């Protein structure tokens, strides 16, 4: 056992037990708790870690580029993207026998390979890459970028280059920089790549380092830009007959507003995507000039927030809502946990939206027909969104424990939220019970009547409000005649008066899985409410954890016990499981439960449509046994049969992962149910045996072995539960989809 310990916490170094290891892991990244930590040092360390994070991302991208260029089949994919299965990398495994070697030698490879379900091939193809050489060049560039960002991280820890605390807390300048430079410039730079490289390549015109200065992206050049004749850039778009990657049917437009999908690539029009990026880049650059700069021009955030109150002489409420946002500016500025919570919540919502839109409005050429990749990407992004959202509430709770100042926030919105927490929490509890009892009640009723041979007695509710929303966006099948589904409405007349061709109505009324809004019925209505139950229950646990973080009637001094504590002292057994950490821990189980329902729904509905059997979802999705039998059991069949006495197949690895995932998941329960005393006794018995066994007793250790604390065991249990859950469902999604569609 190590005798030295990192210098960040001398208290750990004195601990005579194996707790040191666990507390070391727990506090390694809790910079605030480290010895000798000042606020300025804290900000500098965090700023430096951002560059390290960027380096890891750049290295990961470089690795993907390198291995696909080296071992993949990108150039073959470019020639036939709808039929060539993309290769992620080769497999070199000394354990492979002839059966598995043969099974994994696929997609035209000469040896065993893994198939890529990441969508990287489609992305690189869409943005104009065509050769392995280009992938290698990009890989080298990303590797250099990783080195450069690592150097930047190191540099900003050196005395001469450490930013000051005042620099970090200059909110207006930081917002201006992030909005205008990071978001604005990068969006316009991406427009540049799309216009100069991707769009010409999609029209069969090669643009590379050899000719990029001589190939005009538009016949008129910059003349329309300087003469304000911007409409010229939208004229002569690609036709509906255009063959992606060739000049056949190609136009010359670079910024369009066509809507819908390119008929052949079944992805958004590249010229629409370019238009989106230049528009949003322009908006961000304008936004990056809103806040007060070093010349005193622009808005002060403090003035804006403090103007948002009810003390204005013309305000009808006359201060009845307290002082609203006074103190909020200082609270957010001085709390990294508050800022992180806001950032995680925003990013969590954005990631969930990305998951939805990658399926509903695919932006990469031909990816919509790679059903396994689409399923994997949806699942991947929804799971990430879940982790980000739980993290947002976790850091919100840490803010209340560590950073909240009751004096500074007296009678403002934060104090008012804390003051009305009983009403908030009890209402959420009521909502979850209403949703839970009604949804489960209808599902179980339907199960019973189907089991007894009376399926016509099911309670089937049409989602009329959601159907109305779909109709308003132009879906004709429901017969609602609202807004865009009514040809005579003001919305339709305005849409029809737009110059040029527009294809939104074609997209929304498609009969396949690419319709922007899929048809919905009673099965969708029920699972929607099941998902709403999961969302509200997760939110209830997390919001309660944050709002109760400082104290409750049961434990008034909770804030002094910290973010994570097992129980409030001996003899007060009723106080266990009440820390904010415990709320996060419990919410994780509900969040995993919820995200499974979300992805089950998306996956099954799409499988049914892709197979031309949409009735399966519509009819079986209205009762629980239908979900268990026709989705879970039916699609597990390939996994359970992945390898058998007659040999193996290309799904074997997923079958093994499916089984292994269940094992990891089940291991979690050992830590979640068996608690400390049992383990402590077992450890002491094992130590006794070790010390009396020849040869083994030559190895000793300094630390007294101690069982995991309740909080530590919960962390280990939750980690196994989560990782097992993801391994199991990931293998299920990929194998069940690729087993049907390749």
UniProtKB/Swiss-Prot annotation:
Keywords per UniProt: 4Fe-4S, Chlorophyll, Chromophore, Electron transport, Iron, Iron-sulfur, Magnesium, Membrane, Metal-binding, Oxidoreductase, Photosynthesis, Photosystem I, Thylakoid, Transmembrane, Transmembrane helix, Transport
Protein source organism: Prochlorococcus marinus subsp. pastoris (strain CCMP1986 / NIES-2087 / MED4)
Membrane-protein topology: Multi-pass membrane protein
Chain positions recorded as [4Fe-4S] cluster binding sites: 567, 576
Binding site for phylloquinone: 679
Subunit structure: The PsaA/B heterodimer binds the P700 divinyl chlorophyll special pair and subsequent electron acceptors. PSI consists of a core antenna complex that captures photons, and an electron transfer chain that converts photonic excitation into a charge separation. The cyanobacterial PSI reaction center is composed of one copy each of PsaA,B,C,D,E,F,I,J,K,L,M and X, and forms trimeric complexes.
UniProt: divinyl chlorophyll a B3 binding residues: 670, 678
EC number assigned by the record: 1.97.1.12
Keyword Electron transport: yes
Functional summary from the UniProt entry: PsaA and PsaB bind P700, the primary electron donor of photosystem I (PSI), as well as the electron acceptors A0, A1 and FX. PSI is a plastocyanin/cytochrome c6-ferredoxin oxidoreductase, converting photonic excitation into a charge separation, which transfers an electron from the donor P700 chlorophyll pair to the spectroscopically characterized acceptors A0, A1, FX, FA and FB in turn. Oxidized P700 is reduced on the lumenal side of the thylakoid membrane by plastocyanin or cytochrome c6.
Reaction(s) the record says it catalyses: reduced [plastocyanin] + hnu + oxidized [2Fe-2S]-[ferredoxin] = oxidized [plastocyanin] + reduced [2Fe-2S]-[ferredoxin]
Segments traversing the membrane: 46-69, 135-158, 175-199, 273-291, 336-359, 375-401, 423-445, 525-543, 583-604, 651-673, 715-735
Residues that coordinate or bind divinyl chlorophyll a B1: 662
Any Pfam family matching the protein: PsaA_PsaB
Listed GO CC annotations: photosystem I; plasma membrane-derived thylakoid membrane
Entry's family note: Belongs to the PsaA/PsaB family.
Protein name: Photosystem I P700 chlorophyll a apoprotein A2
Cofactor binding, per record: PSI electron transfer chain: 5 divinyl chlorophyll a, 1 divinyl chlorophyll a', 2 phylloquinones and 3 4Fe-4S clusters. PSI core antenna: 90 divinyl chlorophyll a, 22 carotenoids, 3 phospholipids and 1 galactolipid. P700 is a divinyl chlorophyll a/divinyl chlorophyll a' dimer, A0 is one or more divinyl chlorophyll a, A1 is one or both phylloquinones and FX is a shared 4Fe-4S iron-sulfur center.
Places the protein is found: Cellular thylakoid membrane
GO biological process, one term: photosynthesis
